[in-house]
Amino acid sequence: MSYQLSERWTFDMFYSNRNMSGNVDNRFITSLKKDGYYRTSNDFNKRNTFNNQLIGSNLSYNGKYIECGLTGVYNVFNKMLNPSIRYYNTYYARGRDFLNIGINYKLFWKDFIFSGETAVDKRGKIATFNKLSYSPDSDKKFVVMNRFYDVAYQSLYARSVSEGNSVQNESGIYIGMETNLLGN
């Protein structure tokens, strides 16, 4: 549901209640099935074994030189998410409920654009991604991107630039240039 509060302000709300698939051992969810394939009887035994409710909202401002927003998302399962502890999954999400609050921003100044997003989970762990781009003309663009995702940051649905498959335990800088060598 979306509300246009004024010419520049928008408020969005969303809610989801769905059954999900994964391994369930008594009252614990031991793994989430994310591939969507149900080819074997073992796959079918994992289908719709627990419930997830998600509620959230976003307040955003869209101005001439600045765009920004504040987002909050709350997830709750009907069972405890508790994967078996292994060396490789020490910091995987664990618990019954998850809260994430984030801000996004984009500033325009002459040929520069600074943008990014910073989020915090319910335990105070941070994930942030920031980008500065400079376009001196229509054929060239210089970009610097920085990311820092705390080793223990937990968000079930976060997606961002990363070398791994989760927004967790990474930091890095990317420097690049985009150009049109052949012209228009």
Features from the language model and the residues they span:
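Exposed, low-structure sequence patches enriched in small/polar residues
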Residues: 48-85, 90-184
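Surface-exposed coil loops of outer-membrane beta-barrel proteins
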Residues: 1-58, 150-175
